[in-house]
Structure formats: C-alpha cells, structure tokens
Amino acid sequence: DLAMATGLTTLRHLRDNKIADKVAAQGEWLKGKLAELQKRYPVIGHVRGLGLMIGIEIVKPNEAQDHMGCYPADGELSALLQKKCFETGLILERGGRHGCVLRLLPSLLISDAELDVFLDKFEQALLAAGVKPV
C-alpha cells in the first residue's frame, strides 16, 4: 500500500508541476547549446535525444565521410572525454557504434543553472582532452 501511495503521489507531482513540459523545453534548449558547441568543436557529430536524455556523438571530422555523409566514430576520444568529464564531476555513459556516443541522463529535476554548469564542464573536458576549437 505504501509503495502504491508513493507512486501515485509522485505521478501527481509530475503532472501538477508540469515536469514533462519543463524537461522537453530544457532538452530543446540544451540541444541548441550543444549545436553551438558543435560549430566550435567539429569532433561533436550528431546530437540527438528526447527531453534530457541526450546523446552526443564523437567523430573524426578530419577523415572521409561514409556514403551517408557521416564521419567515422571516435571511440577513443569518446572514452577520453568520458574520463575528463568524470574528473570535472560529470558522469556520462558511453554507447552507440564503437562507444562513440556520450549519453547525458540527468535528473528530471535538474535546474537551468545546473545545465549551464554541465555545458561549462563539458567544454572544459573537450579542452582537457586536447580538442582545439575552430
């Protein structure tokens, strides 16, 4: 009974506070900010996601694109970025082809200020990994 009451209370809180709408808006904002970073750091390939569940593909932009226009995956750099992110306090998962996709899976209650901190720390990790902005 306690578990059911807790679950119901949680669902009501999510509905009453429009958490899904907030998360959708934050996700779109964050993908836009990552697109800005992508312009400065071409190792950032495709950025995709739903809400705040976002994947950041890490690629080799100096190599030839395949028949679909995609750069080769860079699993090594992705692993290094994951490590550098961890050193700044960010925990990102890896997945995708050759482990080249960094996965952002924050709490649904993350604040806008915390998303700004993420962006700053992610850029710090790029620089620490030796990625040069263009």
Task: Walk through the language-model features, giving the residues of each.
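Conserved N-terminal phosphate-binding loop of PLP-dependent enzymes in the Aspartate aminotransferase
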Residues: D1-V134
